[in-house]
Amino acid sequence: MKIPYSLYRTLHARYPQAIIDVMAPAWCRPLLSRMPEVNEAIPMPLGHGALEIGERRKLGHSLREKRYDRAYVLPNSFKSALVPFFAGIPHRTGWRGEMRYGLLNDVRVLDKEAWPLMVERYIALAYDKGIMRTAQDLPQPLLWPQLQVSEGEKSYTCNQFSLSSERPMIGFCPGAEFGPAKCWPHYHYAELAKQLIDEGYQVVLFGSAKDHEAGNEILAALNTEQQAWCRNLAGETQLDQAVILIAACKAIVTNESGLM
């Protein structure tokens, strides 16, 4: 959800008067609320794997009263293009994906060598396809994702979790979205934590409840003095709290996790 923010920022920069609404799963709302370019977060009530054409038709029809001028369809799946089609949105832009001719009427055919980065692919959709042939054609600098978090929120949330203001924070995200094969070993995290704590930092471990045990393994490898400067918050934060605390960190060390 964060990478597409570059598209929203680019659209806002090109069309300052445009009203940008985003349809996404309800859990994304805390992230979207930190994107000032986004006017409204519309919850997608259907699950990731569900086709449910009838429900998508009903959802699309419910959006017709908003009279959107353009839709940008970011997932590559066939079903993701159904709602804007049923909503009768005149211009429907996206990468071809699952052969979505007809559902999309501004179809881009992906050349992975020409567009190596996902963020570049999203930003390219904000421009006419005849102009943007490769990533080299994109205006620089790119508008990178940058969630808005205030200093007051950082201070308040750090106090909520009794994190010290005496030492700068380094965040670890030791879990992985797709299993242990993509995990940096916990003992490497532990060695890095020891080094950072001895250099004057505090270490904060982030993740879901399923990552809590991994965090405890990292903690267990530290001596008593070092443990005083390492907090395992995996499974203890809401998404919005995690976003704020990560923004308060000097750096993040992460696997290919959801928080990444």
Which residues does each PLM region occupy?
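Catalytic machinery of carbohydrate-active enzymes
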Residues: 1-260
